Amino acid sequence: MNSSMASAGLGSRRKDPVYRGIRCRSGKWVSEIREPRKTTRIWLGTYPMAEMAAAAYDVAAMALKGREAVLNFPGSVGSYPVPESTSAADIRAAAAAAAAMKGCEEGEEEKKAKEKKSSSSKSRARECHVDNDVGSSSWCGTEFMDEEEVLNMPNLLANMAEGMMVAPPSWMGSRPSDDSPENSNDEDLWGY
Protein backbone atom coordinates (compact mmCIF):
# COMPACT_ATOMS: atom_id res chain seq x y z
CA MET A 1 0.00 0.00 0.00
CA ASN A 2 1.63 3.26 -1.04
CA SER A 3 1.70 6.44 1.02
CA SER A 4 -0.80 8.34 -1.12
CA MET A 5 -3.38 5.61 -0.65
CA ALA A 6 -2.70 5.51 3.08
CA SER A 7 -3.13 9.25 3.47
CA ALA A 8 -6.30 9.19 1.38
CA GLY A 9 -7.70 6.46 3.61
CA LEU A 10 -6.97 8.45 6.74
CA GLY A 11 -8.54 11.58 5.32
CA SER A 12 -11.77 9.77 4.47
CA ARG A 13 -12.23 8.64 8.08
CA ARG A 14 -12.19 12.15 9.53
CA LYS A 15 -15.50 13.39 10.88
CA ASP A 16 -14.41 17.00 11.38
CA PRO A 17 -14.74 19.49 8.54
CA VAL A 18 -11.32 20.48 7.23
CA TYR A 19 -10.72 24.19 6.75
CA ARG A 20 -7.55 26.18 6.18
CA GLY A 21 -6.00 28.10 9.07
CA ILE A 22 -7.89 26.45 11.93
CA ARG A 23 -7.44 23.63 14.42
CA CYS A 24 -9.38 22.14 17.30
CA ARG A 25 -8.03 22.70 20.82
CA SER A 26 -9.91 21.56 23.90
CA GLY A 27 -13.16 21.24 22.00
CA LYS A 28 -12.98 24.79 20.59
CA TRP A 29 -11.75 25.98 17.24
CA VAL A 30 -8.79 28.34 17.04
CA SER A 31 -7.66 30.34 14.05
CA GLU A 32 -4.37 32.02 13.18
CA ILE A 33 -2.51 33.08 10.06
CA ARG A 34 1.15 33.54 9.23
CA GLU A 35 2.11 36.98 7.99
CA PRO A 36 3.56 36.85 4.45
CA ARG A 37 7.37 36.90 4.30
CA LYS A 38 7.60 36.88 8.12
CA THR A 39 7.86 34.23 10.81
CA THR A 40 5.20 35.83 12.99
CA ARG A 41 1.57 34.80 13.19
CA ILE A 42 -1.57 36.81 13.84
CA TRP A 43 -3.85 35.18 16.40
CA LEU A 44 -7.44 35.45 15.14
CA GLY A 45 -9.28 33.97 18.10
CA THR A 46 -11.03 30.98 19.64
CA TYR A 47 -14.51 30.06 18.40
CA PRO A 48 -17.18 27.49 19.28
CA MET A 49 -17.69 26.38 15.65
CA ALA A 50 -15.22 25.44 12.91
CA GLU A 51 -17.06 27.57 10.35
CA MET A 52 -16.62 30.68 12.49
CA ALA A 53 -12.86 30.11 12.80
CA ALA A 54 -12.66 29.46 9.05
CA ALA A 55 -14.47 32.73 8.28
CA ALA A 56 -12.03 34.59 10.54
CA TYR A 57 -9.15 33.03 8.61
CA ASP A 58 -10.73 34.04 5.28
CA VAL A 59 -10.88 37.72 6.27
CA ALA A 60 -7.26 37.69 7.41
CA ALA A 61 -6.13 35.85 4.27
CA MET A 62 -7.89 38.39 2.04
CA ALA A 63 -6.32 41.29 3.96
CA LEU A 64 -2.80 39.86 3.84
CA LYS A 65 -2.69 37.97 0.53
CA GLY A 66 -5.32 39.73 -1.57
CA ARG A 67 -6.85 37.92 -4.52
CA GLU A 68 -4.19 35.20 -4.37
CA ALA A 69 -5.61 33.93 -1.08
CA VAL A 70 -7.07 30.43 -0.98
CA LEU A 71 -10.31 30.77 0.98
CA ASN A 72 -12.55 28.41 2.90
CA PHE A 73 -15.75 30.16 1.76
CA PRO A 74 -15.02 31.94 -1.54
CA GLY A 75 -18.72 32.63 -2.08
CA SER A 76 -18.88 34.78 1.05
CA VAL A 77 -16.13 37.24 0.08
CA GLY A 78 -18.59 40.05 -0.65
CA SER A 79 -20.22 39.83 2.76
CA TYR A 80 -16.99 39.85 4.81
CA PRO A 81 -15.91 43.04 6.59
CA VAL A 82 -12.70 44.64 5.30
CA PRO A 83 -10.02 45.59 7.86
CA GLU A 84 -9.14 49.29 8.00
CA SER A 85 -5.42 48.46 7.68
CA THR A 86 -3.11 45.46 7.64
CA SER A 87 -2.27 45.86 11.32
CA ALA A 88 -2.82 42.80 13.49
CA ALA A 89 -5.43 44.59 15.61
CA ASP A 90 -7.52 45.67 12.59
CA ILE A 91 -7.31 42.22 11.01
CA ARG A 92 -8.28 40.59 14.31
CA ALA A 93 -11.29 42.93 14.68
CA ALA A 94 -12.54 42.26 11.14
CA ALA A 95 -11.96 38.52 11.59
CA ALA A 96 -14.04 38.49 14.79
CA ALA A 97 -16.85 40.35 13.02
CA ALA A 98 -16.80 37.85 10.14
CA ALA A 99 -16.86 34.95 12.59
CA ALA A 100 -19.83 36.50 14.36
CA MET A 101 -21.71 36.82 11.07
CA LYS A 102 -20.87 33.21 10.15
CA GLY A 103 -22.09 32.10 13.59
CA CYS A 104 -25.43 33.80 12.95
CA GLU A 105 -25.70 32.15 9.54
CA GLU A 106 -24.91 28.71 10.94
CA GLY A 107 -27.30 29.22 13.85
CA GLU A 108 -30.10 30.24 11.51
CA GLU A 109 -29.45 27.24 9.22
CA GLU A 110 -29.58 24.86 12.19
CA LYS A 111 -32.78 26.51 13.40
CA LYS A 112 -34.44 26.14 9.98
CA ALA A 113 -33.42 22.48 9.80
CA LYS A 114 -34.90 21.82 13.24
CA GLU A 115 -38.14 23.61 12.29
CA LYS A 116 -38.46 21.43 9.19
CA LYS A 117 -38.04 18.27 11.27
CA SER A 118 -40.46 19.27 14.00
CA SER A 119 -42.98 21.82 12.81
CA SER A 120 -44.92 21.52 16.06
CA SER A 121 -42.10 22.85 18.24
CA LYS A 122 -42.30 26.56 18.83
CA SER A 123 -38.96 28.09 19.65
CA ARG A 124 -38.33 31.74 20.12
CA ALA A 125 -35.83 33.13 17.60
CA ARG A 126 -33.06 35.36 18.76
CA GLU A 127 -32.01 38.22 16.60
CA CYS A 128 -28.41 38.16 15.42
CA HIS A 129 -26.41 41.32 15.06
CA VAL A 130 -22.81 42.40 14.65
CA ASP A 131 -21.43 45.75 15.70
CA ASN A 132 -18.20 47.24 14.39
CA ASP A 133 -16.71 47.07 17.88
CA VAL A 134 -15.29 43.59 18.56
CA GLY A 135 -16.17 43.74 22.24
CA SER A 136 -19.86 44.18 21.50
CA SER A 137 -20.12 41.47 18.86
CA SER A 138 -22.60 38.74 19.58
CA TRP A 139 -24.07 35.86 17.66
CA CYS A 140 -27.28 34.07 18.37
CA GLY A 141 -27.08 34.26 22.13
CA THR A 142 -23.49 33.09 22.53
CA GLU A 143 -20.70 35.34 23.69
CA PHE A 144 -17.18 35.37 22.25
CA MET A 145 -14.22 35.47 24.61
CA ASP A 146 -10.67 34.92 23.41
CA GLU A 147 -9.32 32.80 26.24
CA GLU A 148 -5.80 32.80 24.82
CA GLU A 149 -5.67 36.60 24.91
CA VAL A 150 -7.33 36.90 28.34
CA LEU A 151 -4.92 34.42 29.89
CA ASN A 152 -1.95 35.88 27.95
CA MET A 153 -0.95 32.36 26.91
CA PRO A 154 1.95 33.14 24.53
CA ASN A 155 3.69 35.25 27.18
CA LEU A 156 2.84 32.76 29.92
CA LEU A 157 4.65 29.98 28.09
CA ALA A 158 7.66 32.24 27.41
CA ASN A 159 7.80 33.23 31.08
CA MET A 160 7.66 29.58 32.13
CA ALA A 161 10.58 28.82 29.80
CA GLU A 162 12.58 31.71 31.27
CA GLY A 163 11.88 30.41 34.76
CA MET A 164 13.60 27.14 33.89
CA MET A 165 16.81 29.06 33.13
CA VAL A 166 17.03 30.69 36.56
CA ALA A 167 19.45 29.05 38.99
CA PRO A 168 17.79 27.44 42.01
CA PRO A 169 18.22 29.26 45.33
CA SER A 170 21.25 28.26 47.37
CA TRP A 171 20.74 27.10 50.93
CA MET A 172 22.08 29.36 53.67
CA GLY A 173 24.17 26.92 55.65
CA SER A 174 23.07 23.41 56.40
CA ARG A 175 20.48 23.14 59.13
CA PRO A 176 19.77 19.71 60.49
CA SER A 177 16.45 18.32 59.39
CA ASP A 178 13.77 17.59 61.96
CA ASP A 179 14.06 13.84 61.50
CA SER A 180 17.84 13.54 61.92
CA PRO A 181 19.29 11.63 64.92
CA GLU A 182 21.04 14.82 66.12
CA ASN A 183 17.69 16.55 66.55
CA SER A 184 15.93 13.76 68.40
CA ASN A 185 16.74 14.81 72.02
CA ASP A 186 17.69 11.21 72.80
CA GLU A 187 14.10 10.07 72.57
CA ASP A 188 13.57 6.83 70.75
CA LEU A 189 10.19 6.80 69.11
CA TRP A 190 10.24 3.09 68.44
CA GLY A 191 11.78 1.91 71.70
CA TYR A 192 9.85 -0.97 73.27
From Swiss-Prot:
Its main location: nucleus. It is found in: Nucleus. Keywords: Activator, DNA-binding, Ethylene signaling pathway, Nucleus, Transcription, Transcription regulation. GO terms for cellular component: nucleus. One of its GO terms (biological process) is glucosinolate metabolic process. Residues 179-192 have a biased composition (Acidic residues). It comes from the Eukaryota. Residues 18-74 bind DNA. Residues 104-132, 167-192 are annotated as: Disordered. Probably acts as a transcriptional activator. Binds to the GCC-box pathogenesis-related promoter element. May be involved in the regulation of gene expression by stress factors and by components of stress signal transduction pathways. Belongs to the AP2/ERF transcription factor family. ERF subfamily. PANTHER family: AP2_ERF DOMAIN-CONTAINING PROTEIN, DEHYDRATION-RESPONSIVE ELEMENT-BINDING PROTEIN 1D. This is Ethylene-responsive transcription factor ERF027. It comes from Arabidopsis thaliana (Mouse-ear cress).
